[in-house]
């Protein structure tokens, strides 16, 4: 765990918060000098189950093109593993495990699912789709290059470049926002 990492707290004992990191119990200091706590409003049971699945995977490595849970038509892949994800495979896995929703395979196909929602109306559990520097000048779905799960209060759960994390959206991330989709 690095300074500035966002973690989901599951309990507190004395001066220590309990969290889950890479599927294992971990502890961080509860002293104010070391820890800032943000409280996020709860959503529907389905949304909370999807988020809980994502929280269990914090710290799992990012691998571009990681094996998907299924092929997009519901055929589950025998070589799937939870040892690595890219952004779209992470969303595909947590939406299926948490709510039984079969998301498609890539960000550019997932963005066609769900109900469009504007930035002003995004809510906990919505998928946020972004462009990136390489795709910024493209149009339509070809502009999409990243997906994240919105947690509320400007926080997202996603995986990009290193491992699955919770992070506060930066100005750059907001500038690359293209659209959002609601599933609940």
How should each PLM-predicted stretch be described?
Residues 62-124, 129-130, 135, 176-177:
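Catalytic cysteine-centered active-site loop
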Residues 14-20, 135-147:
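Short, Lys/Arg- and Gly-enriched loop/turn segments at beta-strand edges
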Residues 102-107, 143-170:
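Catalytic Cys-His active-site segments of thiol-dependent hydrolases/isopeptidases
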Residues 6, 20-48:
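Boundary regions of SH3-family modules and the immediately adjacent low-complexity/disordered segments
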Residues 176-184:
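Low-complexity, Gly/Ser/Thr/Pro-rich intrinsically disordered linker/tail segments
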Residues 1-13:
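Conserved beta-strand/loop element in small beta-rich adapter and peptidoglycan-binding domains
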Residues 51-65:
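Extracytoplasmic/periplasm-facing segments of secreted or lipoprotein envelope proteins
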């Amino acid at each position: 765990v690095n300074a500035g990492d966002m973690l989901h707290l599951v309990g507190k004992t004395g001066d220590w918060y309990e969290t889950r990191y890479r599927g294992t119990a971990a502890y961080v200091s509860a002293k104010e000098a070391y820890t800032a706590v943000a409280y996020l409003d709860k959503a529907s049971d389905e949304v909370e189950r999807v988020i809980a699945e994502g929280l269990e995977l914090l710290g799992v490595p990012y691998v571009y093109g990681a094996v998907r849970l299924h092929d997009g038509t519901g055929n589950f892949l025998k070589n799937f593993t939870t040892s690595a994800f890219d952004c779209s495979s992470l969303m595909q896995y947590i939406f299926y495990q948490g709510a039984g929703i079969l998301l498609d395979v890539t960000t550019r196909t997932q963005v066609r699912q769900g109900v469009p929602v504007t930035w002003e109306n995004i809510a906990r559990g919505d998928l946020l789709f972004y462009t990136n520097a390489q795709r910024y000048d493209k149009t339509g779905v070809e502009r999409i290059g990243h997906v994240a799960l919105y947690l509320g209060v400007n926080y997202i759960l996603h995986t990009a470049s290193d491992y699955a994390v919770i992070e506060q959206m930066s100005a750059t991330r907001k500038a690359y926002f293209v659209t959002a989709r609601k599933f609940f």
